[in-house]
């Protein structure tokens, strides 16, 4: 995914805590991410088979669990999502949601997600926010 590595590395060097919240199992994620060692910068992961997880996406629990483990408020978290269930989960948790899609969010989704077609847009916004405040 274009700009993913730059976004993760920027967060890492800036000291921004990160979590990977996924419906995939630990084994599936290990397989999918093996070719991308830069993902090891993400210090926390909540997998679909996490033993503490009682409900998966679209329930808000995966994002709430990640925020709890990072010791931050979910409302201070930026969630990047590419699925309806993930978007619904992040919105219900109170995260600020960025939907990665070529099409805008459907009207039935609550909250105020931003639809972008590239993580480059998210990176630019993050840099802008971190340099302005």
Question: Which positions does each model-derived feature cover?
Answer:
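Short, acidic loop-to-helix structural element flanking the phosphoryl-transfer center
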Residues: 1-20, 26-30
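Asp-based, Mg2+/Mn2+-dependent phosphohydrolase catalytic module
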Residues: 9, 26, 30-133
